[in-house]
Each structure stands twice: as structure tokens, then as C-alpha cells.
């Protein structure tokens, strides 16, 4: 049953980072990666990543949903006996323009930066034993001004096997669970509640249109999902239909939607986030202050498609939930069909293109 305790509760969906996801490479990817990621064990489940620019060009790397992000985002994939361990952290939607300088790292050719993180905080490793860590994918880069996403570079790591002490790892994961459970609830009253309800109603309408567009097929399916066959059109339409049904129901379902951040995760670059393991979505302050309800500019961000983006992450909406494999139009259109079907921003951009008439 959906919780409605001083918050706006919205419908649930069935679904399952850019960083940390082991995915098939994009259709035009090269075997070599511009960024080399060297993973080593520091102590227990604490891992060090050294990220090196292997290319011949200066890069401005976005750290959100990547190494150096201080939020509990996915940085590596973890495998136990060949099966990926479920991710228990957060997935965020960040801005694609007007980014602050503190989330950008400049790397000249040959230069590196480091990041240390505890993989047991965001994955339940209480079973202990050997696990394998690895990561590859695409990370956004910004223009020379460092404020707007302008491209992507590929990154790839080594495989690192570590032996996990299950008892110690369980304590780290419990800290994340406690973080979720003790947070103070925020209300959905006043103008923020009104703005959120309007966005959710419009999200339902737009998702219905997007489902119809997907069923019909055509150039837009090829543009965003690189396929136009019956099976792909059905998968896309079914996810949009699930989002439409759930976002139109403000009093039932299993996903809880917060108008205000209950966990102090938001920053001036994050629009909203989802904790898939909790089927919980929260807007951030800039959802209201920096974005309109609908953006008519092609590939733009707005409240409606931000909520849609987050809904596709929720594991109770449409199974499996989407991940954050790529952000922004330029990156999303590079993805293979398999990756696009598993990428939240691809669905958001597909739907937004309908509103914008792209």
C-alpha cells in the first residue's frame, strides 16, 4: 500500500550510471577507451579507482554518477558467482547545462584523478566470499566553458577480484538502510505540491502519447532505440503505459513520491532522484526553481520528463527498472538497442521530443 503520510504519494511501476554498469558497447564504439579505470583494493570493501585520460585531447569530465561523486551512486558492477549483485543505492537525474564547476574534473592527456569508495554501502555483500568488480560505459564531457554537456567518452576498467568479509560488509549496507529509514518525511503542500501534481498529470498524458508513438513505430523509434521491430516497439510502449497508469493515480500504488528531499541528497545540480530498492522518488529544489513544467525546446529538460525519467527507475513499476547508462541526447543516440531499452534518459528524451515536435 502506498504511503500518504504528509507527502504526495504516487503510483508505482515495475522496473529494475552512466557509471558502474556493465553493458554492451554502443554500436560505433571502439575497442580502446579514452579513459582507463584502474581498480585496486584499499581495505576490505573499500576500493580505489584511478581514472586516466588515455586520449590525446583535454577533457572536462562530469563526476555526477561517476567517480568522485560523493552520493551513493553506482560506480562499479559487482558479480558473485557470475551473477550481478543488485544495486541498493540511488539513481539521480542531473542537469545537462548550467552545471557548477565543483562537479567537473579537468584531465589533460596522461593526467589522472582518484576516488575511494566502499562498495558494501550500496550492495548487500553480507554473503561474503569472492566477488568480481568491473565497470565500463560512457561518461559525459562538457564544453570548454565547463557548464554544458557536449559529448561523451568511453571508459573501461580492469577486473578486480576481492574476498568479502560478510559480517563487516553487512554493517556497511545496514548504514545505507538506516539512512533510508530514519529520514524525516517532507510534505507535498503549497505550490510545490501543486507543481508536482500538475507534472504527474501531464506525465501520464505524455506517457500515453509516447506509448502510442512507440506502437506506431517509425523514424523516432530508430532514432532513439535503433530498432523498429514488433518486440522492441512493444517493450517501449509497455513501459510508457505502465508509467502513464501509475502517474495518473495519486492515491494508490507502491511508489512513494516526495516533493522535498527527505535524505539531503539533492545538490544544485540534481533535479530529482530515485532509490529503486525503496521504490522512492524525490524531487529536488531545482525541479521547481530552474525548470518549467514542459520544455518545448528539442532535447530540453523539464519537470514532466524528469518525473517520467525517475518513474522508469522504480523497480515496482516495470521490470526490470532502467539504469543511467547515458545522459543527454548526444550520448543516448549512441546506445545500442539493448542499452537504450535499459536507459532512463532515452525514454525521457523520446517522450520530450513529442512535446517539442522534434
Swiss-Prot record:
EC number: 3.4.24.39
N-terminal signal peptide: 1-19
InterPro entries membership: Fungal_M35_metalloproteases, Lys_MEP, MetalloPept_cat_dom_sf, Peptidase_M35
Subcellular location field: Secreted
Gene Ontology molecular functions: metal ion binding; metalloendopeptidase activity
Alphabetized SUPFAM superfamilies for the sequence: Metalloproteases ('zincins'), catalytic domain
Co-factor binding details: Binds 1 zinc ion per subunit.
Keywords: Cleavage on pair of basic residues, Disulfide bond, Glycoprotein, Hydrolase, Metal-binding, Metalloprotease, Protease, Secreted, Signal, Zinc, Zymogen
Highest taxon of source: Eukaryota
Cofactor: Zn(2+)
A Pfam family recorded for this sequence: Peptidase_M35
Enzyme class, first EC level, given as a word: hydrolase
Propeptide: 20-185
Protein's GO biological process: proteolysis
Active site per UniProt: 310
Similarity field: Belongs to the peptidase M35 family.
Protein name in the entry: Neutral protease 2 homolog PADG_00776
Species: Paracoccidioides brasiliensis (strain Pb18)
Organism placement in taxonomy: Eukaryota, Fungi, Dikarya, Ascomycota, Pezizomycotina
Amino acid at each position: 500500500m502506498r504511503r500518504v503520510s504528509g507527502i504526495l504519494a504516487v503510483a508505482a511501476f515495475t522496473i529494475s550510471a552512466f557509471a558502474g554498469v556493465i553493458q554492451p558497447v554502443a554500436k560505433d564504439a571502439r575497442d580502446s577507451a579514452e579513459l582507463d579505470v584502474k581498480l585496486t583494493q584499499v581495505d576490505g570493501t573499500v576500493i580505489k579507482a584511478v581514472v586516466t585520460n588515455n586520449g590525446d585531447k583535454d577533457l572536462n569530465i562530469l563526476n555526477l554518477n561517476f567517480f568522485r561523486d560523493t552520493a551513493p551512486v553506482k560506480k562499479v558492477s559487482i558479480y558473485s558467482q557470475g551473477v550481478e549483485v543488485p544495486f541498493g543505492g540511488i539513481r539521480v537525474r542531473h542537469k545537462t547545462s548550467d552545471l557548477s564547476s565543483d562537479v567537473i574534473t579537468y584531465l589533460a592527456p596522461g593526467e589522472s584523478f582518484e576516488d575511494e569508495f566502499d562498495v558494501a554501502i550500496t550492495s548487500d555483500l553480507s554473503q561474503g566470499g569472492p566477488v568480481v568488480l568491473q565497470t565500463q560505459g560512457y561518461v559525459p564531457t562538457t564544453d570548454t566553458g565547463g557548464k554544458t554537456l557536449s559529448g561523451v567518452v568511453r571508459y573501461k576498467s580492469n577486473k578486480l577480484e576481492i574476498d568479502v568479509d560478510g559480517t563487516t560488509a553487512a554493517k556497511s549496507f545496514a548504514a545505507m538502510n538506516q539512512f533510508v529509514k530514519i529520514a524525516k518525511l517532507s510534505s507535498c503542500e503549497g505550490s510545490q505540491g501543486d507543481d508536482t501534481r500538475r507534472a504527474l498529470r501531464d506525465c501520464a498524458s505524455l506517457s500515453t502519447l509516447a506509448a502510442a508513438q512507440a506502437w506506431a513505430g517509425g523514424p523516432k523509434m530508430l532514432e532513439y532505440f535503433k530498432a523498429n521491430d514488433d518486440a522492441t516497439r512493444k517493450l517501449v510502449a509497455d513501459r510508457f503505459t505502465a508509467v502513464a497508469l501509475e502517474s495518473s493515480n495519486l492515491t494508490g500504488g507502491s511508489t512513494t513520491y516526495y516533493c522535498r528531499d527527505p535524505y539531503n541528497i539533492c545538490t544544485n545540480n540534481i533535479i530529482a532522484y530515485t532509490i529503486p530498492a525503496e521504490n522512492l522518488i524525490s524531487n529536488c529544489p531545482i525541479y521547481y526553481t530552474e525548470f518549467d513544467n514542459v520544455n518545448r525546446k528539442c532535447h530540453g529538460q523539464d519537470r514532466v520528463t524528469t518525473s517520467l525519467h525517475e518513474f522508469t527507475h522504480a523497480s515496482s513499476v516495470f521490470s526490470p527498472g532502467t539504469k543511467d547508462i547515458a545522459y543527454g541526447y548526444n550520448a543516448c543516440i549512441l546506445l545500442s538497442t539493448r542499452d537504450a531499452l535499459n536507459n532512463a534518459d532515452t525514454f525521457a528524451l523520446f517522450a520530450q521530443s513529442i512535446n517539442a515536435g522534434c
